[in-house]
């Protein structure tokens, strides 16, 4: 576990490094914008994936909103995935605006929608915006797999997502046992030439 004191030390080190090499990161750019509040006038500002905005991004939005004729926020509170990084989905839900819910999805097939609805309907009404929408016309399919060994990983390319690095480490050892080539954060499980030769 890292406590606040250690985080502050790490932050100070990163800040010193950036200052020494005259570097600016994405957060620095937003903070500079927010402090200066120097903002051009816009006719329209369109912000996508607004459910995943962090508090400093919402402050930036407030400044843009004051300086724009029209602001469009596009997002879906059911797809909020950056709470761990400080995203404020409640702010998205509470934003006073005219809500337009798109009635049709061209991405989600019916089988996936049915399972998603089973999960989403368990969320209390005060925690999400209720919405009705139609799935893609094709039925699609959902496979219920209880073990990674049951996934045909030798066929085609796969992307495996895990909630934590700890889970990835466990998957890594399983994939090695199965002699499956993989990359995690750019690191190859074994040399590409060896993989090609074995394949």
Where in the sequence are the language-model features?
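Short, flexible, glycine/charge-rich loop motifs used to bind or transfer phosphoryl groups or to couple energy/partner
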Residues: 19, 31-40, 61-63, 89-92, ...
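Accessory N-terminal region flanking or inserted into the helicase ATPase core
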Residues: 1-46, 55-60, 73, 83
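An alpha-helix initiation/capping motif
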Residues: 24-27, 110, 144
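Conserved helicase C-terminal RecA-like lobe
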Residues: 198-199
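Conserved helicase motor core of SF1/SF2 NTP-dependent helicases
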Residues: 44, 51-138, 155, 159-177, ...
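Conserved interdomain hinge at the start of the Helicase C-terminal
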Residues: 141-156
């Amino acid at each position: 576990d890292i406590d606040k004191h250690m985080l502050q030390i790490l932050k100070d080190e990163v800040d010193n490094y950036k200052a020494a090499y005259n570097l600016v990161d994405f957060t620095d750019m937003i903070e500079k914008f927010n402090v200066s509040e120097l903002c051009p006038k816009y006719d329209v500002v369109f912000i996508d994936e607004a459910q995943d905005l962090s508090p400093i991004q919402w402050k930036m939005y407030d400044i843009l909103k004051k300086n724009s004729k029209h602001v469009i926020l596009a997002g879906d509170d059911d797809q909020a995935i950056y709470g761990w990084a400080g995203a404020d989905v409640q702010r998205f839900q509470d934003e006073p605006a005219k809500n337009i819910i798109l009635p049709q999805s061209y991405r989600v097939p019916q089988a996936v929608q049915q399972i998603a609805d089973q999960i989403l309907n368990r969320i209390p009404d005060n925690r999400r915006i209720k919405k009705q929408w139609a799935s893609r016309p094709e039925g699609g399919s959902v496979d219920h797999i209880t073990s990674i060994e049951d996934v045909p990983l030798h066929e085609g390319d796969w992307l495996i997502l895990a909630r934590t690095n700890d889970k990835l480490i466990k998957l890594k050892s399983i994939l090695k046992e199965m002699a499956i080539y993989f990359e995690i954060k750019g690191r190859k499980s074994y040399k590409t030439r060896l993989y090609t030769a074995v394949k």
